């Protein structure tokens, strides 16, 4: 197996309750849901939700027949499964650098509030492109290095890093901000066509959120999004996977979409395990396909 960059692991964390529920982020949640509803395709067959976590946004993808929730945290996926069930959803614990899927098995993918934890952006975007069909939709959100607060602090000499340079900045371990043009270039190199950049969360201020209703702030934000000023703390991008290979495995049944994250070879079901041709096994436990490490 090739060397893996550092991975941010939320295993066992209280991310849901420490960051979202009851933590004053209803405004951000509404804004993100609103953008997804605006730019998602009307329908689709199979969507990959990268960094799905506890399933906060998963119900926004009800227009897809099948949704695969992927996260590195097994415990986050356990909670998501308890809430969502199994009828339309598949749960996969894996790292996004080594996706355990065959090529071209998804006609949609999203990565929201996730890529800021990745130190090798080109590598993970290439991995995502490899499992998507041509002309499929990829929605990527990223933290914006060139936001108005960072630019102001830099101009006043209160910040050590320059928001105008293209290179990512790691302001806390495994927390990166990205220049919009850096992301644009990385998407292009990975095989995506960028169609739109949508700045969001212009009003991410503790004072405003304590003073004004979340719905009102989200409404103002939707107006500001139309300015396309890329100075907000967060930016959504709408992309399609380019290419003319006509390769598609989109109609494969659920179990048949998987491949070895080590070699890419086919996997066979053997009870509660998926097994490759070398005998390496990955376990299915608590209804979750566990590709974090081979089974003992």
Describe each model-derived feature in a short phrase.
Residues 110:
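A conserved beta-strand element that flanks and buttresses the S-adenosyl-L-methionine
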Residues 1-43, 56, 76-79, 139-162, 292-293:
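Conserved class I S-adenosyl-L-methionine
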Residues 161-182:
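Acceptor-substrate binding/catalytic loop of class I
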Residues 122-137:
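A short glycine-rich, Lys/Arg-flanked "PGG" loop and its adjoining helix->strand segment in the class I
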Residues 153, 157-160, 182-185, 189, ...:
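A C-terminal cap/extension of S-adenosyl-L-methionine-dependent methyltransferases
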Residues 1-17, 266-296:
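N-terminal, positively charged/glycine-rich alpha-helical extensions of SAM-dependent methyltransferases
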Residues 48, 52-98:
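Class I SAM-dependent methyltransferase SAM/SAH-binding core
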């Amino acid at each position: 197996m090739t060397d893996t960059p550092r991975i941010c692991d939320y295993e066992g964390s209280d991310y849901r309750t420490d960051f979202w529920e009851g933590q004053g982020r209803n405004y951000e949640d509404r804004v993100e849901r609103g953008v997804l509803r605006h730019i998602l395709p009307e329908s689709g067959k199979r969507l990959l939700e990268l960094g799905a976590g506890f399933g906060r946004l998963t119900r926004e993808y009800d227009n897809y027949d099948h949704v695969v929730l992927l996260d590195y945290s097994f415990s986050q996926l356990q909670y998501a499964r308890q809430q969502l069930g199994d009828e339309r959803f598949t749960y996969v614990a894996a790292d996004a650098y080594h996706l355990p899927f065959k090529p071209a098995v998804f006609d949609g993918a999203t990565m929201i509030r996730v890529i800021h934890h990745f130190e090798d952006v080109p590598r993970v975007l290439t991995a995502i492109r490899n499992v998507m069909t041509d002309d499929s939709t990829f929605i990527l959100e990223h933290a914006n290095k060139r936001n108005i607060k960072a630019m102001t602090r830099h101009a006043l000499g209160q910040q050590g890093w320059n928001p105008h340079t293209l290179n990512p900045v790691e302001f806390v371990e495994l927390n990166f901000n990205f220049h919009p043009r850096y992301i644009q270039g990385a998407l292009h190199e990975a095989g995506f066509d960028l169609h739109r950049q949508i700045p969001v969360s212009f009003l991410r201020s503790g004072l405003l959120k304590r003073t004004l209703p979340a719905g009102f702030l989200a409404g103002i934000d939707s107006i500001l999004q139309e300015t396309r000023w890329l100075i907000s703390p967060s930016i959504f991008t709408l992309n399609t996977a380019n290419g003319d290979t006509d390769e598609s495995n989109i109609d494969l049944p659920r179990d048949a979409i998987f491949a070895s994250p080590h070699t890419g070879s086919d996997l066979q079901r053997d009870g509660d395990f998926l097994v490759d041709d070398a005998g390496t096994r990955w376990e299915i436990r608590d209804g979750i396909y566990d590709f974090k490490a081979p089974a003992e």
